């Protein structure tokens, strides 16, 4: 018996998911294309009203605009869109934050649209179309003649990110075994994707070439998708049993094992294909599934605010820009190992604890950062002990936020029946994208008062922790196929016969 029953087909699925995450890192591209270089004045005799380190970016812009005739753009580690389109100060600086917001609006729209398409037309074709669109428009964004055109193209790229995180994620998850889910998120994860994404941006050094190169990272997925079958679980929900059997045979061949038809399949009758179009309304067709949608969706919202708020603000912190980004990505990747080890050796470490423990540590980290920022700063050097402490604590906090994401994705994937799984994950993702809309504005507000993002993150994090402690379901080890055989909801006279393999309750 192989480790976690992993075969060569599962390995292929793992790598496909990693390439999908390479493209999903478009959501942190604002860290790079929105990078604001330092500003100073070359006028003789010009001095700021107080030491520059004690001025916010908005105050620096105000003094330069009022008293300086010859601005100096300081050397930057990455040539951003801000430099090309002169979006340093005033309303133009706010417009640069809006570009990221528009990108997140695209992800919000994509979550709503692709979730429904994935459940109706199938995981494979919708994933192929969504990823293809993302690559094409991502490459095109590198040639944008204005920031307005760039924003429109990023809106479309945002929809494709949603397709990957919802439909493609469900597609991959329906191919692998329950015991492999944590393995997937441990060794093929956002941290490694972020490392590669940051490396590409470092090599390119310019937002246009980086936009093209990072979009092409997902290209290897497309030819493999053409070769792979549709998800048998999706076929089963549509009562397309013959096609399901053919898909299973191909998967067996790809896995290098003999196809063995399940005993309960031999007596299945050919039924009429399920032509019902499921919508978001089906998530509220019964109390158990509505309960799950509300609870899990609220956690996605809060985690998104915390995650993207901290991520997009990381470019505003002192210290070496690329070193901070590389260390942050590596810390995220390595922190995922703890999930796998806990899941493997401590079976009682369930989905609830996977969310709550990192959440508590994250709140502690950002409360500490908030206190450090509010306290008087006697050291103007970016290498000072105070700024170094903020960077280190921020990296730790960001790593633990990513662990709460794992809990959110695992619970969402394990709680919804196949026929509405991508709608369920899509709805959760929709709520997450609404939360993410706040992130660019939080990063902009940090230019006015640096502690603001951390005040928001800590406040929302505490509410999220309380919801998790009292209401989060535990879904560890759930058989996705069993969710279809024993659905979470029944309507009409059968409501009293509701059956669920998921225990809804507190720790």
Curated annotation (Swiss-Prot):
Keyword tags: Membrane, Transmembrane, Transmembrane helix, Transport
Membrane topology: Multi-pass membrane protein
GO molecular function: transmembrane transporter activity
The keyword tRNA-binding belongs to this UniProt entry's keyword annotation: no
Localisation per UniProt entry: Membrane
Record-stated family: Belongs to the major facilitator superfamily.
Name used for this protein in its record: Uncharacterized protein F23F12.3
Biological source species: Caenorhabditis elegans
